[in-house]
Amino acid sequence: MTSYEILCLLSALSLVISLISSRLHRWQQTITITALALGLSLVILAAGKIFGVSVYSTLVTDLEQLDFKALLLNGMLGFLLFAGALQIKLNVLKQQRWEIFVLAFVGTLISTLVIGGLLYLLSGFLGLQLNFSYCLLFGALISPTDPIAVLAIIKQLGAPEDIAIQVEGESLFNDGIGLVIFVAISQVAFSTEPLTVAGVSGLFIREALGGLLYGGILAAMLHGMLHFSEERTQYLLMTLLVPSAGYVGADMLGVSGPLAMVASGIIIGNVSVPRLLKESEWEHLDSFWLLIESFFNSLLFLLLGLLLLLIHFDAELWWFMLLAVPIVLIGRIISIYLPYFGFRRFRRYNSYAEKILVWGGLRGGLALAMAMSLPTGVSILAGSNIDLRELLMVMTYAVVVFSILVQGTTIPSLIDKSNAEHEAQRKP
C-alpha cells in the first residue's frame, strides 16, 4: 500500500475507535483511543506469535512507510498548535505571563539538566555509562510537555482558569523551546565540527526569537488579508495558510515553526478575529478548527498506540525503561516546585497548582518524533550492540504510555479538588 492509502485507512480506524470511545464515558477520549490502540497492537503481536509472522510483518512494513516524525513535526504539529493558540485568552495569559515564561523557558532547561544528570548517574550504576551529551538529549526531548496531549485533556476537565492557563501556556511554548534545545544538543553530540558557546547560543536565539518574530509577521499578513478580502467566505481557508505554508516558511528560514504557530495563533485569536469577523463567522471559525483539532488528535493518539509494533524491546533495555518514568517525574517535580518557591513569595495560588502542573505534564507524540529523528547506527558504548536511537525510543515510549494512561486517568481527581478549593475561596 502507498502512504496515502495507509493514512486513509488509519483515519477511518481512528474514526471507528473515536465512536467506540465516545460510548465509554469513563475516560477522556484521547486516553481511550490510546488504550484501545495499544490493546489492538498487543492482539496483533500475539496473533503474529501464534499464527506466524506474515500478517504481522505486512502491518509493520506498511506502518514503517509512514514517516511519523515528518507527519507530526512537519504536518500535524503546526495545525494543532495553531488551533490551541487560537483559544488562548490574551488578557488571562498576561496575568500569568511571568509564570508561563519561567516554566516554559527556565523550567524546561532545569528539567533537561536534572533528567540528563540522573540518567548519566544511573547508567553508570547499571554498568552502561552513557555519554553525558546523550543523556542531555533524552532530557531535552522528554522535558517539554506535549501540548497536543495536555490541551486535549485539560480542556475537557475544566481546571480553575489560573491553573489551566499556566498548563496550556507552558505546554504551548515549552515544546518550541524543547525543540530548540534538542537541536542545539544534537549538534553538540553528533557534529564533527568544533562548536562554540556563542554558536550554540546564536542557534537558540535565532530559532526561539526568530520563531516568535516570524509568527507575528504571519499574523500581520493574515490580518491584512482578512481586512482587504471582499469574499468573506474565504476567511476559513485563509487561516489554513498559517500552519501550512507558514510552517514551511519557518523551516526554510531556520526559525522555530512551533513557536511561530503559537505566536500567530494568539495574535489572530485575540486581535484579528474580534476586530474583523462577525460573531457568526467567529463561531464558524471555532467550529472549523475544533474539527481539525479533533481529527488530528484522534489520528495521532491512534498512531501512538500502534507505534508499539515498531519498537524493539531488547532485554538489555528493560532497566532503562523502568527507570525512565521516575527519572522524568523527578525532573518535572524539581522544574515546577523550584520556580513556585519564588512565585509564592509574590502571589497566592491554589494549593493544588504545583501538583496539577507536575501530574498534568503529559508527554506524547512530540517526544517520540524527536527520538525518531535521531540518527541510527550510533552505539551507546564502544563495542556495544545497543543503538542510541533504539534506547531513547524505548525509554520515551515508556514515559509516553505512563503519562497518558496513568497520569491522564488520575489527574481528574486533582482537578476536582482544586475546583472545590477554588469555589470555597470565592464564597464570602
Which sequence ranges carry the predicted segments?
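Transmembrane helical cores of multi-pass secondary ion antiporters/exchangers
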Residues: M1-P428
